[in-house]
Amino acid sequence: TLDGFQAYGGSKNAVVRWMRKLAPVWAKDGVRINAVAPGTTQTPLLQAGLDDPLWGDAIRNFPVPLGGFADPQQIASALAFFLGEESSFCTGSVLFVDGGTDALMRPDKF
């Protein structure tokens, strides 16, 4: 069986693969589909994790090259970009709003 981390990572990959497969199909009808991949974001759920004696240190030490955690408004701004005219030529794209974590941790080869 999958543990929570494997299931979480697998679900993120599934969403991206689904979105990228649909992008060229929907583009024929003028429909764009993109994704925002948020990093660790300041939410009540994150705060509960930070307060947890078992998980708090691991969360605080999670590698974020820019440091700290995202503010929810930063994630909302990325979503607003994809909804606006500025992204009218974007489809099948993933915008990472994670302080550089993906750039740091993504392997060069899969």
Language model feature labels by segment:
Residues 27, 32, 90-92:
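Short, small/polar-rich loop/turn modules that mediate ligand/substrate recognition or access, typified
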Residues 1-28, 40:
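Catalytic loop of short-chain dehydrogenase/reductase
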Residues 63-75, 86:
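A conserved structural motif in NAD(P)-dependent oxidoreductases
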